A protein has these predicted regions:
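Acidic, low-complexity/disordered tracts enriched in E/D and polar residues
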Residues: 1-50, 90, 95-99
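Long, charge-rich, low-complexity alpha-helical segments
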Residues: 37-99
Length: 99
């Protein structure tokens, strides 16, 4: 993803080739791994990363999560997803099909 590029509901994110989502059996948590580093993810963040295939837009991802997490207002969920994706994009962990 181009540095400084804004992620919008129309963006179709996917993990960059250097990033991998893994389940750490020892610690019982998801990790987003990239060269010599890793991020611990909560279940919701792991759901977002799993849906970053390049086929779904951010809007589609939010829609799927809204069905799973019906107790959370969609606007809040969208804001959180956009924020999370922006943060991992800034680390070079996302690419998109619209670039």
């Amino acid at each position: 993803m181009t540095p400084g590029r804004t992620i919008s509901p129309a963006t179709r994110p996917r993990l960059a080739g250097k990033a991998r989502l893994r389940w750490d059996r020892k610690d019982g948590r998801f990790m987003l791994l990239y060269p010599e580093r890793g991020l611990v993810l909560n279940a919701t963040a792991a759901d977002v990363v799993r849906l970053c295939t390049g086929e779904l837009s951010v809007g589609d991802i939010v829609q799927r999560l809204a069905a799973k997490y019906a107790q959370q207002p969609r606007a809040d969920l969208e804001r959180e997803v956009l924020g999370f994706l922006t943060r991992i994009a800034e680390r070079g962990l996302l690419t998109d099909d619209d670039a």
